[in-house]
Amino acid sequence: MRINPTTSGPGVSTLEKKNLGRIAQIIGPVLDVAFPPGKMPNIYNALVVKGRDTVGQQINVACEVQQLLGNNRVRAVAMSATDGLMRGMEVIDTGAPLSVPVGGATLGRIFNVLGEPVDNLGPVDTRTTSPIHRSAPAFIQLDTKLSIFETGIKVVDLLAPYRRGGKIGLFGGAGVGKTVLIMELINNIAKAHGGVSVFGGVGERTREGNDLYMEMKESGVINEQNIAESKVALVHGQMNEPPGARMRVGLTALTMAEYFRDVNEQDVLLFIDNIFRFVQAGSEVSALLGRMPSAVGYQPTLSTEMGSLQERITSTKEGSITSIQAVYVPADDLTDPAPATTFAHLDATTVLSRGLAAKGIYPAVDPLDSTSTMLQPRIVGEEHYETAQRVKQTSQRYKELQDIIAILGLDELSEEDRLTVARARKMERFLSQPFFVAEVFTGSPGKYVGLAETIRGFQLILSGELDGLPEQAFYLVGNIDEATAKAMKLELESNLKK
């Protein structure tokens, strides 16, 4: 599907038409605007309020039309703070949806929801813009090839492999490591992946956005000397922004990614942290617009809003968008409408467990809850599939035995079950891995483990060849050879202590 990019955003030639309205009412980030009869703007049109507040400060607020109220009034949601706005102020209808800069000039830059650079590096060197509201590609344009996307993270590649050009969700409650995992994936994939990446920070901490930017500059993903050679564009609408900005910033990032896919015909990585905040912002806006809340207080249009974003994230015959999305799980409840609605759109789900995080096993990926449509013998091969299934079966058996162990103790188990528990505990620890982005916290250098090495390691544990090694030797190591070397080191240390 080809985009027809325009060469002017709202605020250039479109403002010359001067379809003017006036503010009739302001309720927080929501404005009611009265227009002359027959001059009503369309839904999703961008409106601009320009003027001065009571102390003479310049005001420039962009809004998006959400409802037509009748009596020549529209209700719009502001994309920035509405401080200083007053009733009777002039509002300009731009006659088009919000448009943002697209193309190679966006790489290495940080944008807000309106596509304005916020990195103090001057204006963006492009006049090509694209509207943030577009329809999804038609069925006939979609690409259905199946291939695996290697991440270098053992637990992901073995148990819930990612699809190239697919949608992946990282589910987890507060503080279990979603953002660190996303940053590691950016580190591993964006470096190895020749194409471009777009990162959408939706309603997350400003500090994390800043850390990510600094890290990308250090690793060379953003080239400070020659910005044009950078590999990533960053779009941020953080926690302190009004709900309108948080609701639309995901679409801004997606629009930039779509241009690389459709016009430049590239394979693109789209990272979104956090898709729950997109839903949360939609819920806030829905309440402000006076809609009746639905299940658990969410907006009645939850599925539609999610679908309109997710259906545009897809692979076409021109290029692909592989999307990795962090999904906050409120109160660790996966049945909450926000994560539950997201599940339906994903090819792979990586579920992070608080129990594993509490044990200090990072990444805290739950081997039993995480799923992938790619884990089929015809796609990954018999050897990979068999190993993954045996790892899951052993983990499941260990989980079933935990109650018995808690009540009666390990000694009451049969010899076979004791062996299963010992191997499951080794595997649980072997699924942990030192991350490149966490080197400063852990003190251990990060490890990238290829898929073949991962499969070999788990086969050795399952076969019983490593039954004699202590389980702590498998904790936070890369491949299986490092685990055996660590076991020898531990044995040497214990002998010296004696």
UniProtKB/Swiss-Prot annotation:
Its main location: plastid. It comes from the Eukaryota. One of its GO terms (molecular function) is ATP binding. It is found in: Plastid, Chloroplast thylakoid membrane. InterPro entries: AAA+_ATPase, ATP-synt_VA_C, ATP_synth_F1_bsu, ATPase_a/bsu_AS, ATPase_alpha/beta_chains, ATPase_F1/V1/A1_a/bsu_N, ATPase_F1/V1/A1_a/bsu_N_sf, ATPase_F1/V1/A1_a/bsu_nucl-bd. SUPFAM superfamilies: C-terminal domain of alpha and beta subunits of F1 ATP synthase, N-terminal domain of alpha and beta subunits of F1 ATP synthase, P-loop containing nucleoside triphosphate hydrolases. It catalyses: ATP + H2O + 4 H(+)(in) = ADP + phosphate + 5 H(+)(out). The keyword Thylakoid applies. Its EC number is 7.1.2.2. It is a peripheral membrane protein. Keywords: ATP synthesis, ATP-binding, CF(1), Chloroplast, Hydrogen ion transport, Ion transport, Membrane, Nucleotide-binding, Plastid, Thylakoid, Translocase, Transport. One of its GO terms (cellular component) is mitochondrion. It is an enzyme of class 7 (translocase). ATP binds at G172, G173, A174, G175, V176, G177, K178, T179. One of its GO terms (biological process) is proton motive force-driven mitochondrial ATP synthesis. The keyword Ion transport applies. F-type ATPases have 2 components, CF(1) - the catalytic core - and CF(0) - the membrane proton channel. CF(1) has five subunits: alpha(3), beta(3), gamma(1), delta(1), epsilon(1). CF(0) has four main subunits: a(1), b(1), b'(1) and c(9-12). Produces ATP from ADP in the presence of a proton gradient across the membrane. The catalytic sites are hosted primarily by the beta subunits. Belongs to the ATPase alpha/beta chains family. This is ATP synthase subunit beta, chloroplastic.
